[in-house]
Amino acid sequence: MKDKAYDITIIGGGPIGLFAAFYAGLRGVTVKIIESLSELGGQPAILYPEKMIYDIPAYPSLTGAELTENLIKQLSRFEDRTTICLKEEVLTFDKVKGGFSIRTNKAEHFSKAIIIACGNGAFAPRTLGLESEENFADHNLFYNVHQLDQFAGQKVVICGGGDSAVDWALALEDIAESVTVVHRRDAFRAHEHSVELLKASTVNLLTPYVPKALKGIGNLAEKLVIQKVKEDEVLELELDSLIVSFGFSTSNKNLKNWNLDYKRSSITVSPLFQTSQEGIFAIGDAAAYNGKVDLIATGFGEAPTAVNQAINYIYPDRDNRVVHSTSLID
């Protein structure tokens, strides 16, 4: 059965894609979001759900999880004209009569216009690289923290020396029974002030050590074996939970198959966010132009322009004058 053609398909379900979908709903068009991950929200939802964000207009501060929740709630007003496809990676798209054919790893979709809001691309955690690691993943071995309270009263070991590792250690200090940070260097890569707070805290610091093995029963890790760098000293750390904070690798590997113009790993766009292919637009971190500022707030501002241009492309003969939301929603 042929999929119906949506007015606008948004590639990427992060903050910018979600707001673009909301604004498209506000303009009365049908929208499909295609997201490669298993949930909406992008990096704020996956990488820093409990870290504070301070540069969203009208919010002195809010967490990545709160930002995602608010955007999804905002979009739900137009759920009757919005379709969301999760765990789908866009491979290619081609111009066809009446729009575009979009091929993913699961299906073929049809759309009259496309807005690319995939950020820096799909991302995956950098792992320990140890045998049996995958067996413990998402049971009591984590690559990001969704809820601090889940570690209450636990012995927590954190591997890493960057901002996230240090931030999680400080955040868990008063929640967990104990927190131990294992880093391969004596010096930390995190912000100096955070490192000062860490060294003055009750967090146990083990440097320079590297993980060598994991021991456990079933799907639960019980001990992390570490070895001192350039020495034979080996320690076994008992743990209830292990957080691996080595960062995430991003990949826009499929971007190069989309036959657009690029600047490094981003898509070159016009002042109206038109790509080199008519009917296809790009916003957020996926878009490149002179003076670009890579902030969520910037992407929020780009979204309405891209949506309006997409509507002008789809319906050139329609009265497409933009009106304020106060005139559209009671």
From Swiss-Prot:
Catalysis: reaction(s): 2 reduced [2Fe-2S]-[ferredoxin] + NADP(+) + H(+) = 2 oxidized [2Fe-2S]-[ferredoxin] + NADPH
Cofactor(s) the record lists: FAD
Entry keyword Isomerase: no
Enzyme type, top EC level: oxidoreductase
Database matches in Pfam families: Pyr_redox_2 (PF07992)
Top-level taxon of the source organism: Bacteria
InterPro entries: FAD/NAD-bd_sf (IPR036188), FAD/NAD-binding_dom (IPR023753), Fd--NADP_Rdtase_type_2 (IPR022890), Ferredoxin-NADP_redctase_2 (IPR050097)
PANTHER family: THIOREDOXIN REDUCTASE 1-RELATED-RELATED
HAMAP family: FENR2 (MF_01685)
Protein name: Ferredoxin--NADP reductase
Organism: Streptococcus pyogenes serotype M3 (strain ATCC BAA-595 / MGAS315)
